[in-house]
Amino acid sequence: SELTIRNEKGKDFACIEDMDFQIGRVLEALKETGEYENTYIFFTSDHGIAIGKHGLMGKQNLYEHSWKIPFVVSGPEIKKNTEAKGNIYLLDVLPTLCEIAGITIPETVDGISFNKVLRGKKNKVRNVLYGAYSGGFKPGMRSIKKGNWKLIKYDVMDGAFTMPRKVQVNQLFNLNKNPNELLIEHQNEGVIAITKNIPKKNQINLAENPKYKSRLQKMEKLLFSEMEKVGDPFKFWNQKWVI
């Protein structure tokens, strides 16, 4: 309900305010000890919750509003007020810290150092970003992102506590033109009245559009490749088993 969403947003804003205060205390302590200019500061977070977006409340989804998280770094030789557009995983933080500290990166580490990205010597370290959600009644939710294109693939049970049904759906988005991953439902007059947002006609799921069949196939192939690469045991209805 609208009241629930307002309540959750209030909690969100309160958390942000307190977090800002606590970070300020840390920064002041560094300045008081004279270590501020000689310290690398990494700020990031856990995944957020939807709070009404896409009609969802939790974070059991792979949309950008829940999947994408803040990542801010400051420190010596890092240019202020700059932004890197590339992708990273949190597992890339360890090798990055090792490289900054002059420590040999362990061979067992799967991450990639983005130290050169921080220093403006490289634009990105990853072209592809893979995401998975495997909780509860929705074990088959996977996503792949490359450039402006993103595919979310579902093989899940919907309404598991009432009348469960199998849902096998693809969602294809051009994030450059549809950054909020809007669906056809967002063009409903009732939804527009609540959100006060009028989507453009092409801001929908493109997976069912024959014009984007080739793009869908390419993204699916890339997704399946990444699943095999990381050893993901789940298999979609149209995914071939590799023995």
Question: What is each model feature region?
Answer:
Residues 12, 16-19, 23, 40-45, ...:
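Beta-strand elements within well-structured catalytic alpha/beta cores of enzymes
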Residues 1-39, 100, 214-215:
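A long, amphipathic alpha-helix that forms part
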Residues 47-53, 79, 91-94, 99-195, ...:
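C-terminal cap/loop subdomain of S1 sulfatases and analogous C-terminal strand-loop tails that border
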Residues 25-38, 99-108, 212, 222-237:
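Surface-exposed helix-capping loop/turn segments at secondary-structure junctions
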Residues 50, 62, 71, 83, ...:
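Conserved beta-strand positions that form and line the central face of beta-propeller blades
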Residues 1-7, 15, 19, 137-140, ...:
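Long, internal low-complexity/basic segments
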Residues 4-8, 54, 75-81, 99-100, ...:
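Flexible glycine/proline-enriched surface loops and loop-helix/loop-strand junctions
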Residues 28-79, 89:
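Histidine-centered active-site microenvironments of extracellular/periplasmic hydrolases
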